[in-house]
């Protein structure tokens, strides 16, 4: 089975410009490809997983990844898939985030012996002459055509700034620049980037008379059509300081029954034949084993074998005894926040990140989905005495430790 065939079999491919040429290049290790990452936070998150795994797969097949950090475009803001204008960032914040990204990516990508490179488009975009851009690049783009793309149509009613309107031109110029300087002949990205990617291939064709290719990756959506990688606390980060290895493991251990096989195919390096065999007989205990395999595989990939072993052992200990709290996610509550040594259950649930609002916490309590120190809490007005270590159980699988500082 070729690399390209496996990508299709796993369901990784959404759209592409030329299937035969793309397959030929990546199957023979002749693709120098790039994927862009927006440095809008100081850590990668689950939303980046698809791109990271694709880069790793293609590099293992002899292809060369270029990681493009959008230090320049982050100062504009990408309207693709957005309904509001994004806050612009300072150069200092962007550089800090770039440094954090490089460190995390090294777990996925081999940067030795020039096997992969990291570039920042701020290095060329911030030095461009405006008149030159208008003459050399702007002349290659049709405003009429740009306005037909969904990313702009969605924003027209609420207001699209000229600043954001330039994003497609800047991203297209990135591809053109990488093609010239590094022989980059292919771009990969999320399906919401399709219009921007086509702009790059067209610019290369018009300016250089050469062919370049684009392929979009399937978006990581759950069975309800919502993007995966969110919890009550927010994003699921790849930084252990933001999302602990145990929390990361638990996120994947608790995916819905309908999503586990899809996640194994899209995100792990478990052989596709093994996954397909599991899919044919997936029920009962085998379903739990599939979820454990998913959680362990991804935790090992992101945090290493030792952290994955610890997370798995902690999860099993908690589920079997309900008492092992050593590796539980923990929230420290300042003593000053307590009244007579206690706190209302609804406030406590929100502060611990177990619920997004008091209303959600109230419904959960009323439905019998909350226990504190092995005692079910059914009164939304209950005051919980916090003394030493307090263990909250949400539903059947989520455990959380609260300590007072």
Predicted regions: what is each one?
Residues 1-193, 201, 208-213, 226, ...:
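NTP-dependent nucleotidyl-transfer catalytic core
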Residues 204-405:
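Conserved nucleotide- and phosphate/pyrophosphate-binding catalytic cores
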């Amino acid at each position: 089975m070729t690399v390209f065939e496996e990508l299709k079999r796993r369901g990784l491919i959404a759209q592409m410009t030329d299937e035969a040429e793309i397959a030929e290049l990546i199957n023979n290790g002749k693709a120098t490809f790039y994927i862009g990452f927006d440095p809008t936070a100081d850590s990668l998150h689950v939303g980046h997983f698809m791109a990271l795994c694709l880069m790793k797969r293609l590099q293992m097949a002899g292809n060369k990844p270029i990681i493009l950090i959008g230090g320049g475009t982050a100062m504009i803001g990408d309207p693709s898939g957005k309904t509001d204008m994004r806050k612009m960032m300072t150069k200092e914040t962007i550089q800090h985030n770039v440094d954090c990204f490089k460190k995390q990516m090294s777990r996925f990508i081999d940067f030795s012996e020039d096997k992969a490179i990291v570039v920042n488009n701020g290095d060329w975009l911030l030095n461009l002459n405006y008149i030159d851009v208008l003459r050399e690049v702007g002349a290659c783009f049709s405003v009429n055509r740009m306005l037909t793309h969904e990313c702009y149509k969605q924003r027209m009613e609420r207001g699209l700034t000229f600043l954001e309107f330039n994003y497609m031109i800047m991203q297209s110029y990135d591809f053109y620049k990488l093609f010239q300087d590094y022989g980059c002949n292919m771009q990969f990205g999320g399906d919401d980037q399709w219009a921007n990617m086509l702009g790059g291939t067209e610019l290369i064709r018009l300016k250089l008379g050469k062919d370049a290719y684009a392929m979009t990756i399937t978006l990581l959506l759950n069975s309800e059509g919502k993007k995966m990688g969110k919890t009550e606390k927010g994003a699921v980060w790849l930084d252990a300081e933001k999302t602990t290895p145990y929390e990361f493991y638990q996120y994947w251990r608790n995916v819905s029954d309908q999503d586990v096989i899809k996640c194994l195919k899209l995100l792990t390096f478990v052989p596709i034949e093994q996954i397909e065999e599991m899919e044919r007989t997936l029920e009962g205990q085998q379903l739990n084993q599939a979820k454990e395999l998913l959680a362990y595989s991804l935790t090992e990939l992101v945090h290493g074998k030792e952290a994955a072993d610890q997370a798995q052992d902690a999860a099993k200990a908690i589920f079997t005894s309900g008492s092992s709290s050593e590796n539980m996610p923990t929230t420290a509550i300042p003593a000053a926040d307590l009244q007579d040594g206690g706190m209302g259950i609804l406030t406590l649930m929100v502060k611990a990140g177990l619920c997004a609002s008091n209303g959600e916490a109230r419904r959960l309590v009323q439905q019998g989905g909350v226990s504190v120190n092995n005692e079910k809490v059914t009164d939304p007005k209950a005051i919980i005495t916090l003394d030493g270590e307090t263990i909250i159980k949400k539903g059947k699988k989520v455990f959380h430790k609260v300590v007072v500082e």
